[in-house]
Amino acid sequence: MGKDTIADIITSIRNADMNRKGTIQIGSTNITENIVQILLREGFIDNVRKHRERNKYFLVLTLRHRRNRKGPHRTILNLRRISRPGLRIYSNYQQIPRILGGMGIVILSTSRGIMTDREARLEGIGGEILCYIW
């Protein structure tokens, strides 16, 4: 775990998804809770619960896997960190990129909190582009 908590979340979810793990545990901060709520609302994860262990809070995520005859396969195809501590990427609401023609989502940090690209376009606000999920 480094200083970039958003990159840590993305890496943990990507690694658990590739290894077909059912649950993962990540550190709980305000930013991570907001991003996880967006992932839950958009249907990329099944369940979230807050776990306390020796005065530290963790989020336990249950990933969504579809079953087929050969076993479970992954649902989340790609996660990509865009804005990072060394290079911040900002966009106004007209220039927020559309991922796969609107099939994917862009998570933004705006003045009104962390939200998806659709919500930011509806409210007419831009912000820092945190990550793409498609």
Swiss-Prot record:
Its main location: plastid. Keywords: Chloroplast, Plastid, Ribonucleoprotein, Ribosomal protein, RNA-binding, rRNA-binding. It is found in: Plastid, Chloroplast. Gene3D superfamilies: 3.30.1370.30, 3.30.1490.10. One of its GO terms (molecular function) is rRNA binding. GO terms for biological process: translation. GO terms for cellular component: chloroplast; ribonucleoprotein complex; ribosome. Pfam families: Ribosomal_S8 (PF00410). InterPro entries: Ribosomal_uS8 (IPR000630), Ribosomal_uS8_CS (IPR047863), Ribosomal_uS8_sf (IPR035987). One of the primary rRNA binding proteins, it binds directly to 16S rRNA central domain where it helps coordinate assembly of the platform of the 30S subunit. Belongs to the universal ribosomal protein uS8 family. Part of the 30S ribosomal subunit. This is Small ribosomal subunit protein uS8c. It comes from Gossypium barbadense (Sea Island cotton).
